[in-house]
Amino acid sequence: MELIDSFGRRINYLRLSVTDRCNLRCSYCMPAEGVEKLAHGDILSYEDLFRIARAAVAIGIEKIRITGGEPLVRKGIVPFLARIAAIEGLRQLVLTTNGLLLPEMAADLRSAGVQRLNISLDSLRADTFRAITRIGELQRVLDGIAAADAAGFPPPKINMVVMRGVNDGEVADFARLTIDRPCTVRFIEYMPATRENNWQSLTVPGREILDRISASYELEPVEKGACAGPSRDFRIRGAAGTLGVITAVSGHFCGDCNRVRVTSTGMAKSCLFSDEGFDLRPFLETSDPIILQEALRRIVGVKPERHGMSACKAEHQAFSMAKIGG
């Protein structure tokens, strides 16, 4: 079964947030004091999240990414992931994490059926990492990556949000990681999650990122897979790994968008930058799975052709990336 939106795009990818809480305070994601924590009763139970995931797979979703906040801070996450991994028809279960809890949890996550990890890492320099995350320790993340490798995970995808004057001087350092390691590094254009002034000054366009790398290395394009995300992928000639750029600001990828999102409060969103949301809670009050499936079809049916953000403007309401799931 295929899930097709009104613009002919095949939707096969669900980003499912399990919590708004995080053990970091990254500057591009939330204010220094953090975000107001949602009440326990506002967060969907694991049972309801499982029902949403199962309904999504039933109508054509093949890949589920578990996000937060930081998903690993929610108690009971490992048994929940094992249930998701066992859903018949699901091809990929992946998880995005900041890596801080991987030293203790990587082996259990692998045993639960998580197939791959995306790790948010914005600097390889301890002082810069602390400045961006405000409270994070770089070595913990590096230890987490090592623990994931020891647990048998494939090489991770490392996500770097590039910010001019903050960490853009490390683009070449991150690119070099892929030469000897079969990992993937994705450079993400800085995107405004709030109505901040002069955010454009922080954005390094994807073209500039690639030009910086190309100044030292020859890049070859890499073909994308069926459930791939929005990055344009390349390989340094002869390298073991790959790199990519995600250009939400300078060159939207809406024509190839294959995803929907569900927040930890049960709001379904067909676009990260859309102000529209669809509350799934009323459809969780019945035990009839068809009703929930039709609700998910409805949000796909109103998926916009493209978002309203560009390098000149950001036509969306302020939001917390931690609450919406990225």
Curated annotation (Swiss-Prot):
Transmembrane segments: none annotated. Monomer and homodimer. Pfam families: Fer4_12 (PF13353), Mob_synth_C (PF06463), Radical_SAM (PF04055). NCBIfam families: moaA (TIGR02666). It comes from Geobacter sulfurreducens (strain ATCC 51573 / DSM 12127 / PCA). Its EC number is 4.1.99.22. [4Fe-4S] cluster 1 binds at C22, C26, C29. Signal peptide: none annotated. This is GTP 3',8-cyclase. GTP binds at R15, R65, T96, K157, R259, V260, R261. Binds 2 [4Fe-4S] clusters. Binds 1 [4Fe-4S] cluster coordinated with 3 cysteines and an exchangeable S-adenosyl-L-methionine and 1 [4Fe-4S] cluster coordinated with 3 cysteines and the GTP-derived substrate. One of its GO terms (biological process) is Mo-molybdopterin cofactor biosynthetic process. It catalyses: GTP + AH2 + S-adenosyl-L-methionine = (8S)-3',8-cyclo-7,8-dihydroguanosine 5'-triphosphate + 5'-deoxyadenosine + L-methionine + A + H(+). Keywords: 4Fe-4S, GTP-binding, Iron, Iron-sulfur, Lyase, Metal-binding, Molybdenum cofactor biosynthesis, Nucleotide-binding, S-adenosyl-L-methionine. Belongs to the radical SAM superfamily. MoaA family. Catalyzes the cyclization of GTP to (8S)-3',8-cyclo-7,8-dihydroguanosine 5'-triphosphate. S-adenosyl-L-methionine binds at Y28, G69, S120, M191.
